[in-house]
Amino acid sequence: MVYSQLQALKRNYYLDWLRNLHKGKPKTFAITFMGVKQICTIEGENLKAIQATNFKDFGLEPMRRKTKGAMPFADKGISTTDGKNWEFARFLVKPFFYREVYASIDRVDPYVRKLFGLLPEEDGVTFDIQPLIQRWFLDLTSEFIFGKTMDSMTYPDRANITWTMLDVLRGGRLRIQMYKFLWAFNWNWWLKAVYEVHDFVNVHIRSTYKELAAREQRIRDGLPVGPERVDLLWYMATHVRDEEELRSQLCLVFVPNNDTTSIFISNCIWHLARDHEAWQKLRKEVLDYGDQPITFESLRSMPYLNGVLNETHRLTPNNIVQVRACLNDSVLPLGGGPDGKSPLYVNKGDLVSVTKTVMYRDPDIWGPDVDVFRPERFFGVRGNWNFLPFGGGPRRCPAQMMVQTESAYMLFQLAKRYSRLECRDPEPYTAVMRIGPSNINGVKIAFYK
């Protein structure tokens, strides 16, 4: 099984591999993976148990920190720890929850306008929009995290760190999954990428510490100081004064976060380009809105726009599998008994894996057209544990509202600007695994005004 999984990742059929793993089996079943019992499930109630009702019984640290799978890239951070260490890491990302950040259209708009300046001026020109969206998001997120944009849309070479971070993520995923064989996954290319990212982040950390020390000295001397920085690094640096610890905390936010929204928006466009009717419905909703000011609330009130976002999350979720280690003997509400409807006992040390890419295509939940892109299926649907793209409970993704706002605004402006969107790549979606699935051929399209 280890070999088949590695081959699936290497040859870019990992999503099919996961679906085949579940094919013909109950909705909750157990396997043995590298000598550890792993409970695989697509039951929303079981996801609720590990993320909310029995939250304290399940965690990440045994898989990610104690195994040293993420080292030397990072040690303590929001995605590697449990308990008090996790609570502190969660506290350090508090700026993600500031409404003035996640609800701000003014923060996003200048970057969207700049991206539009890079799109082909003539109608019908074939191009790949995915790398442009990656540069757009790098510029947007670097301002929020470091207080200064990288401006890779003006200087494309500055986006090279993005590809380095992708190497870190790809290697890190394998090392964490195959933690018992770390000696076989200590590649020079991965270590080189890790140290390049460290060098990049260290420059920002040291500059911030220097600026912070100068500010604190002026305050002690009774001298005036200017407005305080409001970026994430500044906030973190005021609470963590050890450079190595701060780098670990920051890397576990910056590196995974750098890939999420750009992949998601690219996937949205990939689906829309293959559905002329969906693009026209989205455009009609946008044009019907008129010239009113666009706000966080107005974006959230558009049913078709949000249906597009949710349907993209469903068909191509960024978080395809959520795995938790059982920290204390516990119980899942479903999976036991002959019919799988009774509680299931979980021993300390077992793993529970919720395969979202299979759950989100379960005909019992979504009907017979599970493989069809149909945003209307979300009209009037309230959130539930069968569909939580950003997770739930205390470990819900802190960037949820920010991702939704940035993505909705980008699609709104594209639909307003272009009357037609055409697919220029007939090949099916072939997922390369990064932080989430990304199409191997990019997103080749053409716009018409």
UniProtKB/Swiss-Prot annotation:
User: Which reaction is this enzyme known to catalyze?
Assistant: (3E,5S)-3-[(2E,4E,8S,10E,12Z)-1-hydroxy-4,8-dimethyltetradeca-2,4,10,12-tetraen-1-ylidene]-5-[(4-hydroxyphenyl)methyl]pyrrolidine-2,4-dione + reduced [NADPH--hemoprotein reductase] + O2 = 3-[(2E,4E,8S,10E,12Z)-4,8-dimethyltetradeca-2,4,10,12-tetraenoyl]-4-hydroxy-5-(4-hydroxyphenyl)-1,2-dihydropyridin-2-one + oxidized [NADPH--hemoprotein reductase] + 2 H2O
* Gene Ontology MF term list: heme binding; iron ion binding; oxidoreductase activity, acting on paired donors, with incorporation or reduction of molecular oxygen, reduced flavin or flavoprotein as one donor, and incorporation of one atom of oxygen
Membrane topology per the entry is: Single-pass membrane protein
Residues holding heme: 397
Q: Where in the cell is it found?
A: Membrane
**Top-level division of the source organism's lineage:** Eukaryota
A GO-annotated cellular component: membrane
List, separated by semicolons, the cofactors it needs.
heme
Q: Which UniProt keywords apply?
A: Heme, Iron, Membrane, Metal-binding, Monooxygenase, Oxidoreductase, Transmembrane, Transmembrane helix
The pathway this protein participates in, as annotated, is: Mycotoxin biosynthesis
Q: Where are the transmembrane segments?
A: 28-44
List the Pfam families.
p450
The protein's Enzyme Commission number = 1.-.-.-
InterPro entries in alphabetical order: Cyt_P450, Cyt_P450_CS, Cyt_P450_E_CYP52_ascomycetes, Cyt_P450_E_CYP52_fungi, Cyt_P450_sf
Q: Which family does it belong to?
A: Belongs to the cytochrome P450 family.
**Function in brief:** Cytochrome P450 monooxygenase; part of the gene cluster that mediates the biosynthesis of ilicicolin H, a 4-hydroxy-2-pyridonealkaloid that has potent and broad antifungal activities by inhibiting the mitochondrial respiration chain. IliC catalyzes the ring expansion of the tetramate intermediate to the acyclic 2-pyridone intermediate that contains the trans bis-diene chain. The biosynthesis of ilicicolin H starts with formation of the tetramic acid by the hybrid PKS-NRPS synthetase iliA with the partnering trans-enoyl reductase iliB since iliA lacks a designated enoylreductase (ER) domain.
Q: What is this protein called?
A: Cytochrome P450 monooxygenase iliC
Q: Which organism is it from?
A: Hypocrea jecorina (strain QM6a) (Trichoderma reesei)
